[in-house]
Every structure is written in C-alpha cells, then in structure tokens.
C-alpha cells in the first residue's frame, strides 16, 4: 500500500463529460491532451479524465445513457472493458494502455470514470470473480441500484468475493496505467460507506498510486472525516 501523499493541491485537468457526454472518442481525447500538453501543462494542468461511456458501444446520447438496459462490454471476469469503436487502440486486449502511454509520453496523466457495483451483464452471465471460487450472483445486491444509470447493481460487501471483485477492477486499471479514478454513485442520494471502503482498499493495494475522486457531489459534510480518510476529492 502506497503512503505517498496524492493531490496535495486540487488536481487540474479536463473531463470529457461536459463537452462530449458518453460519446467521446480516442481522437477527441488525444486532441484535448495535445492542447493541454502544449498550452496548459506549464501552468499545472495534467489530468485527462474519460467520463462515462468508454465501455458502451453506440452510447452517444443522454437518452441512450438513461436506457433501462444500457449495452456494456465486459470481460470473462465481469469487468467493464473498452469499446474499441470509440477507442481503436484498445483492440487485441490492450485496453486503455496505449492511450495512457500516449498521455504519459506528453507528461500528462489519464483518468477514467467508473460506477459503484457490478455490471448487470456480469450478473446475468454469472461471471466468475477473478482469483476466487465465487461468482457475480454470490456478491450482488439487486436491491441496490443507481437512481440515474441502470447498468449496475450494488455489491453486498458482507459477502465473500465482494472485496476481491473490486480488487480485480483496480488490478485491471493498474495494468492499463490509469492514474485517476472518478468513482460515481457513492455519495448521493445514498452514502455507500461499505463500497467506498472497498474501492479505497482496492486502490491502495496497488503499487501504482491512484488519485481517487468520489461522486456525485457535493460531499455530505456529516461524513467529512470518513471522506478525508478514503479519497483525495
């Protein structure tokens, strides 16, 4: 577990959501990265964050994002993987590593958006949890769902295999070279204490330091002590 201090100052960068929603492509990410490297990096800007939709082919509009059954790509362990239509360099199992390598070569850092829980496709297929004898249906809490995006169920952190699932996510992100994770559906309308803890534990087990951002805001002030102990922002 890394003890390095991360994000001593508020991170400065660009998030794809406001401009592109769920439709952002690799070329658009690179174009913004190039502009940042050439014009803003000298002032402290360094993060490029890909928001929702990097795992969802054909998800271009808000209406598709709000669909009751969003199309999402998963691997054999029930983890979201990259839509190669939007991100061609992710082909052949490369994931976001080629894009991360490109950003790192320009002195920048790559972030991604994730959701609390496990994809509905993983539960439907009852995919195995990497490194365990458990499966998706052993850890899922079907009564716990995001109020605005319906691609996930919550995870029951009292179940064996639950922490291991989150661990497997950050193992994957580590292999891609991800630097920043925006984890959504954790603060409001329900404060998902146990899954916040699980995500933090998973991130801290990796040698690679992850800046962890919890969403959606604003942060509930009654939980400020806990938040200070688990995330950077």
Residue spans of the language-model regions?
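Aromatic-lined carbohydrate-binding/catalytic grooves of carbohydrate-active enzymes
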Residues: 36-174, 178-185, 189
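Stable alpha-helical elements in mature extracytoplasmic
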Residues: 25, 29-32, 92-99, 166-169, ...
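Substrate-binding cleft/loops of secretory-pathway carbohydrate-active enzymes
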Residues: 218-233
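Short, hinge-like loop/turn segments at secondary-structure boundaries
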Residues: 128-131, 200, 229-231
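Extracellular/periplasmic catalytic domains that process cell-envelope and extracellular macromolecules
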Residues: 4-9, 41-43, 103-105, 174-175, ...
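N-terminal module-boundary/linker segments of secreted carbohydrate-active enzymes
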Residues: 1-30, 35, 210
């Amino acid at each position: 577990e890394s003890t390095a201090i991360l994000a001593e100052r508020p991170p400065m960068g660009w998030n794809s959501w406001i401009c592109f929603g769920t439709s952002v492509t690799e070329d658009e990410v690179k174009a913004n990265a190039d502009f940042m490297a050439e014009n803003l990096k000298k002032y402290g800007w360094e993060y490029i964050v890909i928001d929702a939709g990097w795992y969802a082919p054909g998800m271009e509009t808000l209406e598709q994002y709000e669909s009751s059954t969003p199309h999402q790509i998963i691997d054999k362990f029930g983890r979201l993987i990259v839509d190669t239509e939007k991100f061609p360099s992710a082909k052949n199992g490369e994931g976001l590593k080629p894009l991360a390598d490109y950003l790192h070569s320009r002195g920048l850092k790559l972030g991604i958006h994730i959701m609390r829980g496990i994809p509905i496709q993983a539960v439907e297929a009852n995919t195995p949890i990497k490194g365990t004898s458990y499966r998706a249906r052993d850890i899922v809490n079907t009564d716990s769902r995001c109020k605005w995006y319906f691609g996930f169920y919550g995870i029951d952190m009292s179940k064996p295999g639950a922490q291991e699932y989150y661990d497997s996510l950050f193992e994957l992100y580590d292999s891609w070279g991800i630097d920043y994770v925006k984890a959504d559906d954790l603060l409001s309308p329900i404060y998902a204490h146990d899954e916040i803890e699980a995500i933090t534990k998973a991130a801290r087990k990796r040698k690679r330091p992850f800046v962890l951002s919890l969403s959606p805001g604003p942060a509930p002030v009654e939980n400020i002590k806990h938040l200070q102990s688990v995330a950077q922002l």
